[in-house]
Structures are given as C-alpha cells and as structure tokens.
Amino acid sequence: MANLLIDDDAVTVSLSVIEKAEALHGDVRVPRTAVVRVRAVPDGMAEVHGLRMPGTGFPGVIMVGTWRDSEGVTFAVCHGRRPAVVLDLAGQAYDRLVVTVDNPEEAVASLP
C-alpha cells in the first residue's frame, strides 16, 4: 500500500516498487500550498472516474495510476473498496490525488 507522507512543505504519495510498475509512474510529490481541499471518503475507488492512461485497474480490486475525464486528471492508488484520502489540487500536473490509507481521518487532520 502507498504511504501518504506529509511534511511542512509537501505531500508525497510514496509508492512501493510493485505500485510503481502498476502505475508506470514514480512517487508523486506536490507542495502543500497546492492542496485546496482534503477529505476522507469511505470508498476511494468510487472517487476515480474516466479513462486509465497509464496504469492498472481491475474493478473492485485495484486502481493504480492516472485517470482522465472531463473534470481533470486524477492520480489514484486504491486497493479494494477501502477508505481513502482525496486531495484536490491547483496548479499541478494532477487535479486530484486519491489514496487508500489505514486512517484517512488522521491524514485529513494533518492537512489544511
């Protein structure tokens, strides 16, 4: 499972070696100032829409990589229908990050 690392300056989605292969992408790092909204959701997969390009997806099982739709570009790391953190971003390559985590409320509390 990916780790959501939060420090004073940035938020980093740290991927495992397998997730990097699934996503065809490395870790994603964005400045904290780019985060315009953050929320916890009960099912991260329900937040990811559009066409996968590139990445890996099996409905209800895994969504890792980039998804594009009319609302923008989402980078997702979702394993099963589990709780996740959704970060809406401004001025970045991705419009949203969706990451399944063990305790999404804790991550939300540590961000603006």
Question: In which residue ranges do the predicted regions lie?
Answer:
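Acidic, Ser/Thr- and proline-rich intrinsically disordered linker/docking segments
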Residues: 23-32, 36-112
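Conserved beta-hairpin
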Residues: 1-32, 36-39
